[in-house]
């Protein structure tokens, strides 16, 4: 059946075998057979290209994937012109914000199948699909409260029960579909620690694990040697339904790593430096592949941090080939030893296992970094590529505060640098640069035990010195998996973090995606009263203006231990190399160097507290959760749409659909809706966070009887196309050059010269046919 995930014909006589751990024979489609036929020089192909080639070779059926496609990929060279190729990822991964609309479309296709007289149960994912519910939890209750996690989870279920009932229907009625309940972790960390197989058996053939996902940071899995990246919903749905995605055969930038990180420098610091270098180099729509002697000095979680931030450096992916470090991590994370051995044997036979003797492939271009040159750093205040050395942070902050508004500037007159607002009841003044949000968050860093333990040890050392957080700081700790709290407990660090206010608030994305929760009312009032530029410090991957919190304009990415350090300092207006982070009860200054844990302390703690049993234990019940298990659902081929729902609605895309589609017609007399500058992100195009009642989406909900307190977020309402149409380009910080002097989702309606919302203009143009 065309498009279904079945074994294609062996058109290149490439089927081969290897001896498995058990002594049995394993079969695979051999790339070396192509080399023997003179179609490629395998050692010269980047590993990432080899995986694209394996997919095409295995799926070559002469129809969806042709012999010409295989030969095109096999003949990849650094200088070849880009040509379109098919790629069949072996699975799809979803998070709930973008996954819900994908499942809505599958449900709608089933309805359309009935309308055409067909069997709706034939509409199913044809490849494994995992949806991890991680985007909905919000930090309503901060880390200052010991019961924050349980209370936030309870609120999450109350807000999202309608969505979760829908996903429960999908889990019960769709083939090849699995849902990980709320409170179990962040999709990319769960993928890294549990879902990914690195290689597996499919239709009697061993294949490399590969995937696409409906989240930009799907790229994190490339740190494990699994090729994957984020795609749009339509592409993801195509793969779910057994179709290839089509892409230009990419250029591959080689990134050579040499040396080792110095003591006190974290994987986060290294990653921010790599982001900066690759942004300067230019890698948009390209693969980046890492190699070099320095690779052996990076742990697998270090690599995963680098791979996670591929969207921030602009690449399609940042790929690390599978090597012994990969296998070590598979053992640590509790994978079956026999599977790990078979992975090594298969990938070695396939030419996909990297060793110190592996020849360096040819690359389109190359870049090099000596890891010993990396400095402790942050990135901000508005973009992840704007790295600043920790030693220069105070000077940088003051420059940004007073520079004209832009990618870094805030436009504050130097005469107003000392503006402040008194906070009643706290007996403190809030000033420019004060940090109101400090969040240990995001799979980017919470997947890395070294930096997480460093944060915990720094917290312990700070407590021993008698330090406390400043009263205006809202702290939170949101690990990407429950394994983190297992090793925190084993190391005795849970209590230390909690003492400072870093109680666990949930296992989900939280602050990293803008679900930072509300600031206290007196803090918000103080910000508004003096138009203060206040800050956040988070261990996330993005810090675009308006993303973290609408009141917080200066947002800095940093390692988890630096998040704790800045929470103690309470301000961006500090030189942590030379100024005290705080004072003891005897008014003795405490420097950052006094509480920063040594490498030996971190490594010894790591050795003593992290075990494979923790991963096995925590993932043994990952598909279960008491509230989730109690959600009622029943077997039904068709979803029962609720007419009054403002979360899940039957989309109109398939109305009047025919078995034979109508011919595509050209678009004529279209109008321009937006003209935008640089650094436009998915956040600008389709924001995921909170939204105001006065915009088109808010007004739609108000008209449908939804109270402001129940708005939830844009992301949570992506299962309703009516909300999403009104939310497109509705970011509160977007600047449309067509509607000069405005900020937010505004445009000019050309026939009348009126400034109206982007949604209203689009509807007028559609109605008028112009």
Q: Which residue ranges define each predicted feature?
A:
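Fe-S-dependent hydro-lyases/dehydratases of central metabolism
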Residues: 2-770
């Amino acid at each position: 059946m065309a498009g279904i995930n079945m074994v294609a014909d062996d058109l290149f006589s490439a089927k081969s075998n290897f001896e498995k751990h058990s002594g049995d024979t394993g079969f695979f489609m051999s790339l070396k057979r192509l080399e023997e036929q003179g179609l490629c020089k395998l050692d010269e192909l980047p590993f990432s290209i080899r995986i694209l080639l394996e997919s095409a070779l295995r799926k070559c059926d002469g129809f969806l994937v042709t012999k010409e496609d295989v030969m095109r990929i096999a003949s990849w060279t650094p200088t070849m012109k880009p040509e379109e190729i098919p790629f069949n990822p072996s699975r799809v991964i979803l998070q709930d914000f973008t996954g819900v609309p994908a499942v809505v479309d599958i449900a709608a296709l089933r309805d359309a199948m009935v309308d055409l007289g067909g069997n709706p149960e034939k509409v199913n994912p044809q490849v494994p699909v995992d949806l991890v519910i991680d985007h909905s939890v919000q930090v309503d209750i901060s880390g200052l409260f010991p019961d924050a996690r349980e209370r936030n989870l309870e609120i999450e279920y109350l807000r999202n029960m309608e969505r979760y009932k829908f996903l429960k229907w999908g889990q019960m009625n769709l083939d090849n579909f699995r849902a990980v309940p709320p409170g179990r972790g962040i999709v990319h960390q769960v993928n890294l620690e549990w879902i990914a197989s690195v290689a597996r058996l499919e239709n009697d053939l061993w294949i490399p694990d590969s995937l696409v996902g409906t989240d930009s940071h799907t790229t994190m899995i490339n740190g494990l040697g699994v090729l994957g990246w984020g795609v749009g919903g339509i592409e993801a749905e195509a793969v779910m339904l057994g179709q290839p995605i089509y892409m230009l055969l990419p250029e591959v930038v080689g990134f050579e790593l040499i040396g080792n990180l110095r003591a006190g420098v974290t994987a986060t610091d290294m990653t921010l430096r790599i982001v900066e270098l690759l942004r300067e180099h230019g890698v948009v729509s390209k693969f980046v592949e890492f190699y070099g002697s320095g690779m052996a000095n990076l742990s697998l979680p270090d690599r995963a941090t680098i791979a996670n931030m591929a969207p921030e450096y602009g690449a399609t992916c940042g790929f690390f080939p599978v090597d012994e470090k990969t296998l070590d991590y598979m053992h640590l994370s509790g994978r079956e030893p026999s599977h790990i051995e078979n992975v090594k044997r298969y990938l070695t036979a396939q030419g996909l296992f990297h060793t110190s003797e592996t020849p360096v492939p040819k690359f389109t271009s190359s870049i090099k970094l000596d890891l010993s040159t990396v400095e402790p750093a942050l990135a901000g205040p508005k973009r992840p590529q704007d790295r600043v050395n920790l030693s220069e942070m105070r000077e940088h902050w003051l420059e940004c505060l007073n520079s004209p508004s832009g990618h870094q500037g805030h436009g504050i007159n130097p005469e107003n640098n000392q503006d402040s607002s008194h906070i009643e009841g706290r007996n403190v003044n809030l000033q420019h640069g004060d940090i109101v949000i400090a969040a240990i968050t995001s799979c980017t860093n919470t997947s890395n035990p070294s930096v997480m333990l460093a944060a915990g040890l720094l917290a312990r050392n700070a407590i021993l010195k008698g330090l406390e957080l400043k009263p205006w700081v809202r702290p939170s700790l949101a690990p990407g998996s429950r394994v983190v709290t297992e090793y925190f407990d084993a190391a005795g660090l849970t209590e230390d973090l909690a003492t400072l206010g870093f109680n666990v608030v949930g296992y989900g994305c939280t602050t990293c995606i803008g679900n930072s929760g509300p600031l206290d009312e007196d803090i918000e009032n103080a910000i508004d009263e003096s138009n203060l530029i206040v800050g956040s410090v988070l261990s996330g991957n993005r810090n675009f203006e308006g993303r973290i919190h609408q009141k917080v304009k200066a947002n800095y990415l940093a390692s988890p231990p630096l998040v704790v350090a800045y929470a103690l300092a309470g301000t961006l207006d500090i030189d942590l190399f030379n100024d005290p982070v705080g004072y003891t009860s005897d008014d003795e200054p405490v420097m950052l160097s006094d509480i920063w844990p040594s490498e030996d302390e971190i490594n010894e703690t790591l050795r003593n507290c992290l075990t494979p049993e923790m991963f096995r234990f925590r993932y043994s019940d990952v598909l279960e959760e008491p509230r989730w298990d109690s959600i009622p659902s029943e077997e039904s081929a068709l979803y029962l749409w609720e007419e009054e729902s403002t979360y899940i609605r039957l989309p109109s895309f398939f109305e009047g659909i025919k078995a034979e589609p109508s011919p595509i017609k050209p678009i004529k007399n279209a109008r321009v809706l937006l003209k935008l500058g640089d650094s436009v992100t998915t956040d600008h195009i389709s924001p995921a966070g909170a939204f105001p009642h006065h915009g088109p989406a808010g007004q739609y909900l108000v008209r449908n009887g939804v109270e402001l307190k129940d708005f939830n977020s844009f992301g949570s309402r992506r299962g309703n196309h009516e909300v999403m149409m009104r939310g497109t380009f509705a970011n509160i910080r977007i600047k449309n050059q067509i509607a000069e002097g405005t900020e937010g989702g505004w445009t000019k309606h050309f026939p009348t010269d009126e400034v109206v919302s982007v949604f209203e203009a689009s509807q007028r143009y559609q109605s008028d046919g112009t």
